[in-house]
């Protein structure tokens, strides 16, 4: 059974700029840095990795979604650091507050916070799923 995601690794064509970008948003460097070919940032119990890529190697589109303590505070931090999110934070119909930001290599990042109702719903679904497994035993 899959238990979770340990890490996401993104390619970068300009490593120093990419490392500065993530540091400015508050990511903690665990290994590597601007001059390393591989850098790992801690994201609580998971990791975001950057790996240097040759210019001719292009990546396809993708999105990484990070849950954060305060969506609006991180949005303000991004603006203060000189970055320009696509739009201001908003409340989504699926129960999250979020905003998107494109990193220096074109990767789309989403910074979100689930609402209590969504968190409660997921906990209830997990409990019900566990109970149904007990009934089958």
Predicted regions and their residues:
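Core segments of cupin and vicinal oxygen chelate
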Residues: 2-3, 9-48
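Vicinal oxygen chelate
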Residues: 13-16, 64-108
